[in-house]
Curated annotation (Swiss-Prot):
Catalyzes the methylthiolation of N6-(dimethylallyl)adenosine (i(6)A), leading to the formation of 2-methylthio-N6-(dimethylallyl)adenosine (ms(2)i(6)A) at position 37 in tRNAs that read codons beginning with uridine. This is tRNA-2-methylthio-N(6)-dimethylallyladenosine synthase. GO terms for cellular component: cytosol. It comes from Psychrobacter arcticus (strain DSM 17307 / VKM B-2377 / 273-4). It catalyses: N(6)-dimethylallyladenosine(37) in tRNA + (sulfur carrier)-SH + AH2 + 2 S-adenosyl-L-methionine = 2-methylsulfanyl-N(6)-dimethylallyladenosine(37) in tRNA + (sulfur carrier)-H + 5'-deoxyadenosine + L-methionine + A + S-adenosyl-L-homocysteine + 2 H(+).
Length: 496
């Protein structure tokens, strides 16, 4: 598998500008759509993926469209690739420079192999556009998140230009926002494994002052209901048991039904729960502004909804939330969580936090610590604030020193780590639902899977019967703490 995955929330966790507490099980199985088999061909494509789950999903679709149109094969080895694709993310500090730094390394490969085709996609491509080819003229294709379905045409155009003017070649750029048409041109989803992402919408219309997403992915556009369900039907028929619904703000889903009426997100959850074969539903990411009562009620009505919610709050201070243009208060957020806990007492929570936002005082930070302690977040994706070009917050004075930001982040992370450890230890002696995914690499007499709360669960099982259990939902009694994100137990029953 050639897709190298970085999460903007967890990439380079040791770097000075970000620390993240994350589950041990990351995108291994969630990469399934990007692991699809493609037609046999001599051309090979290597993809490196930076960023969020949306980018992981998009990278899988890049491979799908090139496999479907040109029979390209995926390669792990960059040195044997005929096509190099970089799916970029603009969330991190100095994202553009990191892209050009990587492109500089790719340039050396192209100097040795002039026929190598290089493409840059994702949010940095959307931001930079023609500037990428001005600074890196050896790049053949530049495309945005909304135009990845046009990769086959861009690839053909790059070859045509090479034939016409091999020494004066001009690359192709398409970073337009053609509504949501890309989903109309994607091939049938193909998957290995028991988990899959399904994108239900693109873009975001919230315009938080720190965020580049509305400028790189456009405003919110929802896929029609039937299109979403057709993709899920296809994945379920291939053995997928867990669906993760994706969007920058899935709560804002407004998909059109075939009768012209609008399907909201809570209703979509009900539709997905009725798809044969789907046993678990996750979604990411959400916005508190639209985490409505009908979504909360779905947790009482749909056992398929896992007992885990990722609901970014960004800060525990109302003053900072106002400066971030989040358009909700801490009391609203806490009330939402309390309603959910009344329905699902075992719900596990995770969130996003930005530490050191412009104007953050000691009291603002203490308010954030108080919130983290009160709600006992299971884990957190936590950033030190850094300016994103083109955002309103970039115009604010960055008046919190880097030293203070680092100290605050370390203090905040200790609170989260303590909570993570406590919650994992609390699992010992309880029973949890687990999606069985594979044989444990280091313990061939054990199977491993993922609990609702994202913990990895390992349990012994008869070696000659392991295949029968893969893809099943089982009940496991937890007997031992292994690590902050891993436990061990004994199987009690097969549930589905």
């Amino acid at each position: 598998m050639s897709v190298t995955v970085f999460n903007p929330r967890i990439d380079d966790a040791a770097a000075s500008d970000i620390t993240a507490v994350t589950p041990a099980v990351t995108a291994l199985n969630e990469l399934s759509s990007a692991q699809a088999p493609v037609k046999s061909a001599t051309k090979k494509v290597f993809v490196t993926t930076q960023g969020c789950q949306m980018n992981v999903y998009d990278s899988g679709k890049m491979l799908d469209v090139l496999g479907d149109s040109h029979g390209m094969e995926v390669t792990h080895d960059i040195d044997e690739a005929d096509v190099l694709l970089m799916n970029t993310c603009s969330i991190r500090e100095k994202a553009q420079e990191k892209v050009f730094s990587e492109l500089g390394r790719w340039r050396k490969l192209k100097e040795k192999r002039p026929d190598l085709v290089i493409g840059v996609g994702g949010c940095v491509a959307s931001q930079e556009g023609d500037n990428i080819q001005k600074r890196a003229p050896y790049v053949d294709m530049v495309f945005g998140p909304q135009t990845l379905h046009r990769l086959p045409e861009l690839y053909d155009q790059s070859h045509q230009q090479r034939e016409i003017a091999p020494k004066n070649r001009i690359g192709t750029v398409d970073v337009s926002f053609p509504s949501i048409e890309k989903f109309d041109f994607l091939p049938e989803p193909r998957v290995e494994g028991f988990k899959a992402f399904v994108s239900i919408m693109e873009g975001c219309s919230k315009y938080c002052s720190f965020c580049v997403v509305p400028y790189t992915r456009g405003e919110e556009l929802s896929r029609p209901l039937d299109d979403v369900l057709a993709e899920i039907d296809s994945l379920a028929a291939q053995g997928v048991r867990e669906i993760n619904l994706l969007g920058q703000n899935v709560n804002g889903y407004r998909g059109e039904k075939d009768d012209g009426n609008i399907c909201r997100f809570a209703e979509l959850l009900h539709y997905v729960s009725h798809v044969d074969g789907v046993e678990r539903i996750r979604y990411t990411t959400s916005h508190p502004l639209e985490f409505t009562d009908d979504i909360i009620d779905a947790y009482a009505q749909l056992p398929e909804l896992v007992s885990h919610l990722h609901l970014p709050v960004q800060s525990g201070s109302n003053t900072i939330l106002a400066a971030m243009k989040r358009n909700h208060t801490i009391d609203v957020y806490i009330n939402q969580i309390n309603k959910l806990k009344a329905i699902r007492p075992d719900i596990h929570l995770s969130s996003d936090f930005i530490i050191g936002f412009p104007g953050e005082t000691d009291q603002d930070f203490q308010d954030t610590l108080t919130l983290a302690k009160e709600l006992n977040f299971d884990h957190s994706y936590s950033f030190i604030y850094s300016k994103r070009p083109g955002t309103p917050a970039a115009e604010l004075p960055d008046d919190v020193s880097f030293k203070t930001k680092k100290e605050r982040l370390a203090e905040f992370q200790k609170v989260i780590i303590d909570s993570t450890l406590a919650k994992t230890h609390e699992m010992v002696g309880t029973t949890t639902r687990v999606l069985v995914e594979q044989v444990a690499n280091r313990h061939p007499d054990c199977l491993i899977g993922t609990a609702d709360n994202t913990r990895t669960v390992m349990f012994p099982y008869a070696v000659d019967k392991m295949d029968e259990l893969l893809g099943k939902i089982v009940s496991v009694r937890i007997t031992d703490f292994v690590s902050p994100h891993m436990v061990k137990g004994e199987i009690e029953a097969v549930l589905a």
